[in-house]
UniProtKB/Swiss-Prot annotation:
It comes from Staphylococcus carnosus (strain TM300). Keywords: ATP-binding, Cytoplasm, Kinase, Nucleotide-binding, Transferase. Belongs to the uridine kinase family. It is an enzyme of class 2 (transferase). The lineage of its organism: Bacteria, Bacillati, Bacillota, Bacilli, Bacillales. It is found in: Cytoplasm. This is Uridine kinase. The gene is udk.
Amino acid sequence: MNATTIIGIAGGSGSGKTSVTNEILHNLEGHSVALIAQDYYYKDQSHLTFEERLKTNYDHPFAFDNDLLIQNLMDLRNGIPVEVPTYDYVNHTRSAETIAFQPKDVIIVEGIFALENKTLRDLMDVKIYVDTDADLRILRRLMRDTKERGRSMESVIEQYLNVVRPMHNQFIEPTKRYADIIIPEGGSNKVAIDIMTTKIQSLINNQQ
């Protein structure tokens, strides 16, 4: 089997990571690509009451089961299919359903803490940080969490001010220094995305 290229895409909540990822996916047509969201790996909280789950800080590195993510990536790189967990954002715990992933030429890992864990970083061939102004990030998060995750506007704003913003400044922003490339303005920066895609395609060709 050909070697697998692993790409990490990090950045604050609402920074445009998904837009950058989609642009890269579009530019890598012709290659087999798997997209794994770090959000799949929020820790199982079924042992906690619902009230206790509501107190969970989802913007802290400890909220993620990085050990499982790392193991899944190692298995995929070794040609072993994996079952990736999913998360129930309404009930705040891991879902019973899993997603089957097959080994691919390229694996993209996308999440706010994709570059925070050293062991995880060491598996990556390319590390990307998406950098976007805070005011735009909060607007995007507000729209996403109210529409897709069943949250009220008030709860999203309160969480941003009390948790998301301080956690971003403490844990996410510093991971920028680990990036091979920093993409300003999210998915709208076509030049940076094209440069990154060229680098990724070169890596893929060298590993085949």
